[in-house]
Amino acid sequence: MIWNTNLRWRLPVACLLLEVALIALFGVFVRYDMDADPHWVQEKVIKNLSTDLENEFYYRYPSFQDVHVMIFVGFGFLMTFLQRYGYSSVGFNFLLAAFGIQWALLMQGWLQSFDGRYILVDLENLINADFCVGSVCVAFGAVLGKVSPVQLLIMTLFQVTLFSINEYILLNLLEVKDSGGSMTIHAFGAYFGLTVAWILYRPNLHLSKERQSSTYHSDLFAMIGTLFLWMYWPSFNSAISNHGDAQHRAAINTYCSLAACVLTSVALSSALHRKGKLDMVHIQNATLAGGVGLGTVAELMVLPFGSLIIGFVCGIVSTLGFVYLTPFLESRLHIQDTCGVHNLHGIPGIIGGIAGAVTASIANIDLYGEEGLAYAFGIERSKLNWSPNMQGRFQAAGLFVSLAMALVGGVIVGVILRLPFWGQAPDENCFEDAVYWEIPKEPKSTALRSEDSSIKPPEP
Amino acid sequence: MIWNTNLRWRLPVACLLLEVALIALFGVFVRYDMDADPHWVQEKVIKNLSTDLENEFYYRYPSFQDVHVMIFVGFGFLMTFLQRYGYSSVGFNFLLAAFGIQWALLMQGWLQSFDGRYILVDLENLINADFCVGSVCVAFGAVLGKVSPVQLLIMTLFQVTLFSINEYILLNLLEVKDSGGSMTIHAFGAYFGLTVAWILYRPNLHLSKERQSSTYHSDLFAMIGTLFLWMYWPSFNSAISNHGDAQHRAAINTYCSLAACVLTSVALSSALHRKGKLDMVHIQNATLAGGVGLGTVAELMVLPFGSLIIGFVCGIVSTLGFVYLTPFLESRLHIQDTCGVHNLHGIPGIIGGIAGAVTASIANIDLYGEEGLAYAFGIERSKLNWSPNMQGRFQAAGLFVSLAMALVGGVIVGVILRLPFWGQAPDENCFEDAVYWEIPKEPKSTALRSEDSSIKPPEP
Amino acid sequence: MIWNTNLRWRLPVACLLLEVALIALFGVFVRYDMDADPHWVQEKVIKNLSTDLENEFYYRYPSFQDVHVMIFVGFGFLMTFLQRYGYSSVGFNFLLAAFGIQWALLMQGWLQSFDGRYILVDLENLINADFCVGSVCVAFGAVLGKVSPVQLLIMTLFQVTLFSINEYILLNLLEVKDSGGSMTIHAFGAYFGLTVAWILYRPNLHLSKERQSSTYHSDLFAMIGTLFLWMYWPSFNSAISNHGDAQHRAAINTYCSLAACVLTSVALSSALHRKGKLDMVHIQNATLAGGVGLGTVAELMVLPFGSLIIGFVCGIVSTLGFVYLTPFLESRLHIQDTCGVHNLHGIPGIIGGIAGAVTASIANIDLYGEEGLAYAFGIERSKLNWSPNMQGRFQAAGLFVSLAMALVGGVIVGVILRLPFWGQAPDENCFEDAVYWEIPKEPKSTALRSEDSSIKPPEP
């Protein structure tokens, strides 16, 4: 096989063609929803709204910005742990997310915000587009270091499409609750990415083994990603919840779950090391599993101690996964999972989906109040014969649909990405920025001397 | 003394036991407050609230997230300035804060949000838990590099307990104003930590002197912490202020104070260097003293120029402290204050407490308006014989109580932490990540060459 | 010429004198606006406001904090790309911004918030002060590495003054729309800075050429700045827009423009490299041009696809500028533009101004609705003979005024900064932190060994 990693024509053409197509489609289809349109001034009078604050903007803007930080800084920097792949981690994540949010506005728009003629966008669409791209960032973690930016654009194109369809099935047909996306974002993204990684299996990846580890400073950069994901996860899980108590509860639950998850991740990391030392990989990743695991139930009545339990379990399972499962997946199943997304998003996503099914099936009027139950599950819009038990079964169905879509979609996309002309690098050059980036020469002397002889002494 | 830093059983057992206890206590005691409960839907009708926006969530969520960033990224990265202690700074701060917020929800809950049967939590509890942990992060700065994570968990357990009691005395018994916590958070945290450091005095710490300095990049990581603390401090000081003008005023005052503080910190840093050069330690720390000093008065009528004066003074005092006081404390009083928390939190916290007493004692109807005065000091809830003078004296009393609690508590906790089996390192191994962390090997060649010979040239 | 870079007296005196003057002026002039004053409690009753949420604080606080992050972390870290100038980039940006916001509160206050006796400040003033300082940060980018902190303070003093006058002319006399400041902030700041750089031309700058490049990690630090600017730009462009739909629309438009800009920046960066490799300089800077270009039209009816087109064009033009224009400016016009602000803020700012003139001149009732049009352009406050065409011409006039003010002001300030006693460094010592900062010695061995021989093995 001839490896040609020179993207001089392929990458520019891909970017420009995609963007021109997006502009054309936006021109034909995308308009502002009422509360972002100047006609809102009249609408306020018609709807008898007392204040501009009733504009959706003020309910969701802070959460939106937090989610935005998670996608670009959170995921971007989390993946900078590799010693020579920092530019690509941050830069390709930036590229795929910037493309993905535009395509998601269209795909999700057609399926969910289409008024027959136009897609009407407001802040909720932007949040949902960020969410959709979040699942692509998850999948990127599985193939990190082994694909070209052109492959990433293609993967994003397909994954956003499949994500939107899967989301439509879950939210609109099965009417499941999944406000933080345990199923639609995390489980779907992880298993999609793992399937792609499986198809793209590289038998000689050990040739770039040396670059698969971190350095001292690359691990600190990665902690920037970890912490912004961890801190803003309450916003992630509450961003599109119902106004009022649901948003409030989702934030509290996620806060609790993540706190518990840190303690069990630390515990297991130390217990599984022969000298009791902590492993940065676990601290960077497993501590976040509590946010993933709470994605489905965040706005439901799990109670704070229920959230703690979920975080407790996810921290343990995720750390165990990093120690035992990732090597197993690579050696036995030929799945090379660079960032261990199976441990951070895969299993915790499934746990979240199961927790959602269980929590929904035990919902009752005592716990929620009569109006509260109707409001929480949107029953007035739904079938009359609604029951908690049925909701629970639909939740479980949603999990299976997500996994099935991820596996089938991952196979198809993986096969497309295996075509040899996307500019991928040979196995021995994986995890290396210099393949796709102009890299600065290191300064001759790395020492920054306080009394540099090249500096003229100042006059006294 | 036999030093055993292998935490393989001690750290996991401590984490898991604590977390299991927390889950049990949360299960028995913690429920959602009304505005995070599904019954809120009915409550809105009963209370005749016009909109979901009246949910406390929308008043405080942006401030909460900013405070959250300050605790985890702000304090965490501020301490990464040490050349070989970045993992521990960020990682142990992460661990103790994640444990501390859970324990604080319980302790503060029992004392302040207990309805006789349950602790009812909403967003304000989360903010207060973060605040409480902030004082532990301050104390951590004093002992940074010299304690094991097990010691930190124990210190957090006790300090959160003492903090909650002290806070209860100040806010509920003495009814002082301290919305940004000059007294409860900063002065208490600093003197508690310094007392612990005094008890844990290490006579041979000079053996790890070499690792007590920074490197070029570790200083830049620390600036991430500094800036997020600096930028979000207006949120910190306004997060639990009264709705409306008080929150608004607290943000403006803090913004002003911090801006002034930067100028005087820079001025003093340059003036105190024989060649007029700036010292990163001062820029990283003293610039923040203006936020600490404004913690008590932030929501009071100090006026913008009063805030500037406080910031002006704090910047000067704090920088002087780093240059003259820290060496004095170490050589004469045997207090080894790794991060100089005495200069950043100790003295400015006392200045803040005094400023609060003065500002309260000159409060009057001209300045606040009649309703404004009652609202600002919550007089309707308090004794009828309220007077500004009395309030001022209670404020001063609050400062003394905080200092007394810190000193007494610090001695007790210090003695407990001196027990030899918590996994602490010998003096010559302080400030070293490798004691508790798996550290990556540095790559053989640090040079990242643009034209790496190991990269196959792409086909033309 | 004798170069004396010892600032021991000059910098402290400058900082302290300026701060004392600011405190005096704040004491005489600055008070709280009504919604940050305790009399607000009564005001609510008088104005019949239903809720504390009507306090301006709740409309704008999240946007304010995002803008604050952009100024201090965004601009500060964006400039850390230089290998030996990270302390100065972050530190001097911190210093000039902290001084600038105070001076801007006064200058903008006298011109726009003066009630005859006092400047009444609220959150909007803080945002505007941050905006004003943003233009100084832009200018700083042009002279980065070549000026002393004393020069920066002087530049800030004058630039804030000129900015405020220019802003007054545009917003109050010409009544142009420029909520995100394409003209007032970006074009003004860039051409002011470039003119200063032109006057301060250093013929022997090639002597410090070696330090003008980046290192691997300095580029990652710079990406922190890039991403926080990119992510929070929707807040920047919407922060002072009208309540409701205008803020909402400005956020959506900016989000779209920035996303498109990333794709065209990547495309051009790859296409212009002989091996198709990406250049970090473009990814760090050109990706942001879409935010600059949308500054004037953000709240107008450009529609999402119009925003995409602006972002598309700005990404291309900006990347071309970095490749072709910056070398041309240096070699032919003797303008040494360290950060390439001409490409990121100059040309995109002009594009934004032109887009504003075009968009305003095609405004009509179909697009905005009758009340919407009046509200969007504030027509009720303005002359009766308002027409879109006239608005368009005033917008164009505003752009010319901004450019003229920048060039004339830049010449004057440049001449002042050329005086030889401000502590500037000789050409061969530019881009070097050690001139003004105490720099840590690099540790003897940079290797952090996992099994450090200096660490006593733990007892079994």
UniProtKB/Swiss-Prot annotation, chains A, B, C:
<feature type="topological domain" description="Extracellular">
    <location>
        <begin position="241"/>
        <end position="251"/>
    </location>
</feature>
<feature type="topological domain" description="Cytoplasmic">
    <location>
        <begin position="146"/>
        <end position="151"/>
    </location>
</feature>
<comment type="similarity">
    <text>Belongs to the ammonium transporter (TC 2.A.49) family. Rh subfamily.</text>
</comment>
<feature type="topological domain" description="Cytoplasmic">
    <location>
        <begin position="1"/>
        <end position="9"/>
    </location>
</feature>
<dbReference type="InterPro" id="IPR002229">
    <property type="entry name" value="RhesusRHD"/>
</dbReference>
<dbReference type="GO" id="GO:0031410">
    <property type="term" value="C:cytoplasmic vesicle"/>
</dbReference>
<feature type="transmembrane region" description="Helical">
    <location>
        <begin position="286"/>
        <end position="303"/>
    </location>
</feature>
<dbReference type="GO" id="GO:0005886">
    <property type="term" value="C:plasma membrane"/>
</dbReference>
<feature type="topological domain" description="Cytoplasmic">
    <location>
        <begin position="273"/>
        <end position="285"/>
    </location>
</feature>
<feature type="topological domain" description="Cytoplasmic">
    <location>
        <begin position="201"/>
        <end position="219"/>
    </location>
</feature>
<dbReference type="InterPro" id="IPR029020">
    <property type="entry name" value="Ammonium/urea_transptr"/>
</dbReference>
<feature type="transmembrane region" description="Helical">
    <location>
        <begin position="397"/>
        <end position="417"/>
    </location>
</feature>
<keyword id="KW-1003">Cell membrane</keyword>
<feature type="transmembrane region" description="Helical">
    <location>
        <begin position="62"/>
        <end position="82"/>
    </location>
</feature>
<protein>
    <recommendedName>
        <fullName>Ammonium transporter Rh type C</fullName>
    </recommendedName>
</protein>
<dbReference type="GO" id="GO:0016323">
    <property type="term" value="C:basolateral plasma membrane"/>
</dbReference>
<feature type="topological domain" description="Cytoplasmic">
    <location>
        <begin position="83"/>
        <end position="89"/>
    </location>
</feature>
<feature type="transmembrane region" description="Helical">
    <location>
        <begin position="152"/>
        <end position="174"/>
    </location>
</feature>
<dbReference type="GO" id="GO:0035379">
    <property type="term" value="F:carbon dioxide transmembrane transporter activity"/>
</dbReference>
<keyword id="KW-0325">Glycoprotein</keyword>
<keyword id="KW-0813">Transport</keyword>
<feature type="transmembrane region" description="Helical">
    <location>
        <begin position="307"/>
        <end position="329"/>
    </location>
</feature>
<keyword id="KW-0812">Transmembrane</keyword>
<comment type="subunit">
    <text>Homotrimer.</text>
</comment>
<dbReference type="GO" id="GO:0006885">
    <property type="term" value="P:regulation of pH"/>
</dbReference>
<dbReference type="GO" id="GO:0016324">
    <property type="term" value="C:apical plasma membrane"/>
</dbReference>
<feature type="transmembrane region" description="Helical">
    <location>
        <begin position="252"/>
        <end position="272"/>
    </location>
</feature>
<dbReference type="GO" id="GO:0006873">
    <property type="term" value="P:intracellular monoatomic ion homeostasis"/>
</dbReference>
<dbReference type="GO" id="GO:0097272">
    <property type="term" value="P:ammonium homeostasis"/>
</dbReference>
<feature type="transmembrane region" description="Helical">
    <location>
        <begin position="10"/>
        <end position="30"/>
    </location>
</feature>
<dbReference type="GO" id="GO:0070634">
    <property type="term" value="P:transepithelial ammonium transport"/>
</dbReference>
<feature type="topological domain" description="Extracellular">
    <location>
        <begin position="368"/>
        <end position="396"/>
    </location>
</feature>
<feature type="transmembrane region" description="Helical">
    <location>
        <begin position="126"/>
        <end position="145"/>
    </location>
</feature>
<feature type="glycosylation site" description="N-linked (GlcNAc...) asparagine">
    <location>
        <position position="48"/>
    </location>
</feature>
<dbReference type="GO" id="GO:0008519">
    <property type="term" value="F:ammonium channel activity"/>
</dbReference>
<dbReference type="GO" id="GO:0042802">
    <property type="term" value="F:identical protein binding"/>
</dbReference>
<feature type="transmembrane region" description="Helical">
    <location>
        <begin position="90"/>
        <end position="110"/>
    </location>
</feature>
<feature type="topological domain" description="Cytoplasmic">
    <location>
        <begin position="418"/>
        <end position="460"/>
    </location>
</feature>
<keyword id="KW-0472">Membrane</keyword>
<dbReference type="GO" id="GO:0030506">
    <property type="term" value="F:ankyrin binding"/>
</dbReference>
<keyword id="KW-1133">Transmembrane helix</keyword>
<feature type="transmembrane region" description="Helical">
    <location>
        <begin position="347"/>
        <end position="367"/>
    </location>
</feature>
